[in-house]
Regions:
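Sec-dependent bacterial lipoprotein signal peptides
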Residues: 1-19
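Residue-level signal for the start and early helices of compact helical domains
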Residues: 7-10, 37, 89, 139
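Bacterial Sec signal peptide processing site at the extreme N-terminus
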Residues: 13-36
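Long, hydrophobic N-terminal alpha-helical segment
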Residues: 28, 32-58
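Mature extracellular/secreted ectodomains of secretory-pathway proteins
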Residues: 46-175
Length: 175
């Protein structure tokens, strides 16, 4: 028993040391819901005028997040019972608005679209346009890539992003 009590402060010191280096706390303690952090950041990412501008990497990443949020609201047990009953329709409308702006067919499954947009965003952050076009092949390829730089304002996307943040940050909600 004394050994266990002696080990407790050492364990606490080790944990605090692990948390104090430059890595994010999420590297030490994984988040159960991978959409929680993007949801919390959504109002800051989507809530400003000109939030996309002419940045195709940001546009692709945002399209991928909206696809992932909509898919989660339809299928993920952590998201299928929201406090806000209009969250799912808001996300479906936002997904449709984003897809129409990018020329993506409504028949493309959300998981496929989310992977395509995430792959394109990663390639664009590395300045690899051919890889981005290849990643976008399932959702329209070069035509979709060309539209990433010329997106109009997407008000339904902005509203849905705020609703997602409210869902995650609301009282009594610890995802």
């Amino acid at each position: 028993m004394k050994r266990a009590l002696f080990a407790l402060p050492l364990l606490a010191a080790w944990f605090l040391a692990a948390c104090s280096d430059d890595r994010a706390l999420n590297d030490v303690i994984p988040v159960a819901d991978p959409l929680r952090e993007p949801a919390r950041a959504a109002p800051f990412e989507y809530g400003r005028p000109g939030w996309i501008g002419t940045d195709p990497a940001r546009a692709a990443g945002s399209a991928g997040e909206i696809e992932a949020f909509a898919d989660a609201a339809e299928n993920d047990p952590l998201w299928t019972h929201p406090r806000n009953p209009v969250l799912l329709p808001q996300l479906q409308i936002a997904r449709r608005e984003f897809r129409e702006a990018l020329g993506v067919s409504p028949r493309v499954p959300s998981a496929v679209a989310a992977r395509a947009f995430a792959g394109a965003a990663a390639a664009l952050r590395q300045n690899n346009e051919p890889a981005a076009v290849a990643a976008l092949a399932p959702v329209g390829g070069a035509a979709t890539f060309a539209r990433l730089s010329t997106l109009p304002r997407l008000p339904r996307v902005e509203e849905a992003a705020q609703a997602v943040a409210n869902e995650v940050n609301g009282r009594g909600r610890n995802r």
